[in-house]
Regions:
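Generic structural signal of hydrophobic/aromatic residues within well-ordered alpha-helices
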Residues: 81, 90, 94, 112, ...
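Short hydrophobic "helix-edge" motifs at membrane interfaces and signal-peptide entry regions
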Residues: 164-165, 367-369, 596-598
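Alpha-helix initiation and N-capping motif
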Residues: 186, 210-213, 309-316, 333, ...
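Short alpha-helical interface patches
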Residues: 201, 210-217, 316-324, 336-350, ...
């Protein structure tokens, strides 16, 4: 209760000082300005709020220096209230140097001082520059009070945005301080809202949340306790200082006088400055690419880290710029539909559609309806592509030596070191991240209800559909996306209680046992999508049993000293040990399926590489083009396997390298399943565009080019360019139709959390 007591005393002091000053003004035959009284009341209302909130126990009091922070904040609020009512006494003294008749400076630094002396407008702008600092603190400190890890340039950018907006509002409202003060208060409210959202969800307020404000308001009173921290209290103090500085800026600045000779010119000047400032900020946030140009990126798995390191406004702007899907040039729904129809017809006329092999596979599929199991194996990749890690490493041997696959090869993905959900999105929908821009995670942003996907497709064929992921259902918003996709059920960590674990993660084999259980319970055709968890980073846990540990004796001759010393080599050891366990689990699973008296197809692939191969790639592969160099990092491997003889297929593990967006089409083509028009278009696209991901694309001559650096002027390059343009058009139609219903209404309810043994958002950011 001492928070309420201190605030009540502060409020009493404010009332006393304001009344005393008002009495003194009247005693001198003066008049108390209503605006001055209004400012004082505003600061007093802060204290009244603290008194009430503290009285009902909603102000934290158990933090270090709580007593000091409460006294300091109330002293600031009382001081601001008094400075407002006494402004006619204080301002002339503080800004005496700015009076037009102030004596010219002499002595040292006279020229520098001359820039301020006798120039009241300059003094007003200086007040606003300082107000921007305190407004920034008023917004940030509530939830982000450790400034030791904030990037200085990002904070400087945030201050510049706030300050220029304040200056623009100041001049727009003809040099009055109310408008910039309202902005400072609005930023404070935003900071408090950010504090509550972080408290409840361990996530910041993000652009996508703006479309759910009404929903948030509806549930705000259900089960939440809106207790504020002492840093929120301190933010009030900073905001009050910002507001006071805005008030004083309005006092010192020269104002337009009606009827004066320069009144019209001053009006136009004010409006011009306002337009330049407000228009400049608008142009800045719309024309400058924060992600690619300024390097301000939001780490979407744990976005809170980005918002804390880069400042709320820069991170929010970067995220807002990224989420709007790029609309292809001259896009129209009719044109996109016509393009899709053209590509689908081209497939229908092709050998791939008319061949005897495809006909036989279709007849078999229609009569047999095999169960289809899709396994996206967490961080499964073959590091032997990096010169065998200069340690004789040969990769996962069982996986690499499977000789009876329908198809296998390199899989070019749109994720590296993380971003599982984007690889999943590409496989499930046939869409490519190459057409959605940088830093985008469709599961968390876009409306998936109308997006075609494999679960929906198999359900239309009479299949039951199951998704499983042995971690939190809320991660990457899967609980909502899987409903939108139409899965019949979603098995999450709650369905794997007591399952075997490795390094605290549910093992691959445990998920395979769950699949076998589902097959045993239901003889009807099923589509099962398994997103494993065993191999997730980090790789410095030290939790591997001794009998499962591998060690690579890597030749470190050409590696950086930092790579040798920062634990990367031990990370490699733990990672390849996990991959070995995945390889053995895959052997176990396929052997078990081989013994079943039912037809089963398995498509298995890795979602991305771990986070460290770039250190080896840059040192060991130095004389190659940029596209080849980069794509080595953005590839894993896939297999499509069946426990029966698929009609029309030799099943000799024919190599067919492709990208994740084509993988589901490849699966359906090989097993004889019906293709959607979009999948038929994929088959046609592959003739000119064999692979594409967020980094680059491959043309028909098997030449890679970076997406940002189109090369080649031959027929293959031209065909690939045309195919990319048509693909972007078709994908926009498939996802967004006319572009009026782009964003999801089913938002992620909890922060992402790697550790399935902890509540969402528990892991603290380092």
């Amino acid at each position: 209760m001492f928070a309420a007591a201190i605030s009540l005393v502060g409020l009493a002091a404010t009332v006393y000082l304001v009344l005393r000053e008002a009495k003194a003004i009247r005693a001198q035959s003066g008049t108390v300005a209503k605006s001055a009284l209004g400012w004082s009341v505003a600061f007093g209302l802060f204290q009244l709020f603290l008194t009430i909130w503290g009285a009902i126990g909603l102000v934290a009091q158990n933090e270090p220096l709580a007593f000091v922070m409460l006294i300091l904040t109330n002293a600031i609020l009382t001081g601001c209230a008094w400075a407002s009512i006494a402004r006619d006494r204080i301002a002339p003294r503080v800004f005496a140097f700015a009076k037009p008749d102030a004596p010219a400076p002499t002595g040292k630094l006279a020229r520098l001082r001359g820039a301020f002396v006798g120039k009241p407008l300059v003094a007003a702008v200086l007040c606003l520059l300082l107000a921007g600092v305190f407004a920034l603190l008023g917004m940030e400190v509530s939830s982000n009070h450790d400034f030791t890890w904030v990037y200085p340039l990002c904070i400087l950018l945030e201050w510049a945005i706030i300050t220029v907006l304040m200056v623009g509002l100041f001049f727009l409202f003809q040099r009055h301080g109310v408008a910039p003060a309202v902005l400072a208060f609005a930023l404070f409210v935003l900071g408090i809202a950010e504090f509550f959202v972080i408290t409840f969800k361990s996530m910041p307020i993000q652009p996508g949340d703006l479309s759910a404000i009404s929903t948030a308001a509806a549930v705000a009173g259900t089960g939440y306790t809106f207790s504020i921290s002492l840093f929120c209290v301190l933010s009030m103090g900073f905001t009050a200082i910002a507001m006071l500085l805005c008030e004083y800026a309005g006092l010192v600045a020269p104002h337009r006088q009606k009827g004066a000779a320069n009144a019209k010119r001053m009006l136009l000047t004010n409006l011009l400055v306002a337009v330049l400032c407000l228009g400049g900020v608008t142009a800045h946030v719309t024309l400058i690419d924060y992600y690619n140009t300024l390097g301000i990126t939001v780490y979407t798995w744990r976005p809170l880290e980005s918002y804390w390191r880069e400042g709320y406004l820069p991170a929010f702007i970067s995220a807002a710029q990224s989420i709007k899907p790029p609309k292809p040039a001259d896009y129209s729904v009719d044109d996109a539909k016509a393009t899709l129809k053209k590509y689908a017809k081209a497939y229908d006329k092709s050998d791939a559609a008319k061949s005897d092999e495809r006909t036989a596979a279709k007849e078999q599929f229609d009569s047999e309806k095999p169960t289809v199991i899709a396994i996206m194996n967490e961080t499964f990749s073959d590091l032997s592509i990096y010169q065998n890690m200069r340690a004789g490493y040969e990769g996962p041997q069982y996986f690499k030596n499977l000789s009876n696959c329908l198809s296998r090869g390199k899989l070019y993905v749109s994720a590296y070191g993380g971003g599982t959900a984007n690889t999943e999105f590409e496989f499930m929908t046939g869409n490519s991240m190459a057409n959605l821009g940088s830093g985008v995670y469709p599961y968390t942003i876009y409306n998936m209800e109308t997006t075609g996907n494999l679960a929906e497709q198999f359900k239309s064929l009479g299949y039951s559909t199951t998704a499983m992921h042995p971690n939190h259902a809320t991660n990457w918003n899967r609980e909502n996306v899987y409903k939108d996709f139409g899965f019949d059920q979603f098995l999450s960590i709650n369905d794997f209680q007591g399952a075997d674990t490795l390094r605290g993660m549910v093992t691959d084999q445990a998920t395979y046992d769950k699949i076998l259980e589902l097959l045993d319970q239901n003889a009807d055709p099923q589509f099962i999508f398994d997103v494993t968890m065993q191999n997730h980073s980090g790789y410095d846990t030290g939790l591997l049993p001794v009998d499962k540990q591998m060690h690579l004796n890597i030749d470190t001759t050409n590696l950086d000293a930092k790579t040798i010393e920062d634990g990367t080599l031990s990370d490699v050891d733990e990672y390849v040990s996990c991959i070995e366990q995945s390889d053995q689990a895959l052997r176990y699973f396929l052997n078990a399926l081989s013994k079943l008296d039912r037809k089963v197809v398995v498509v298995f692939w890795g979602d991305h590489q771990p986070f460290f191969p770039s250190k080896f790639n840059d040192k060991w592969f130095t004389n190659e083009d940029d596209a080849t160099h980069q794509e080595r990092l953005w590839q894993t491997d896939y297999i499509i396997w069946a426990n029966y003889d698929v009609a029309g297929c030799d099943q000799t593990s024919e190599v067919d390298d492709l990208s994740t967006n084509y993988l589901s089409t490849q699966l359906m083509q090989l097993i004889g399943a019906p293709l959607t028009d979009y999948q038929k278009a994929h088959m046609t696209l592959r003739e000119s565009l064999p692979a594409i991901n967020s980094v680059g694309y491959e043309d028909a001559s098997l030449r890679w080019a970076l997406s940002s650096n189109v090369t080649g002027d031959d027929a293959a390059a031209a065909a690939a360019t045309k195919a990319r343009e048509d693909y972007a058009k078709m994908q926009y139609y498939e996802m967004f139709r006319d572009g009026k219903n782009v964003y999801t209404e089913h938002f992620q309810t909890e922060a992402n959390e790697t550790d399935p043994n902890l509540a969402p958002g528990t892991t603290k950011i380092k």
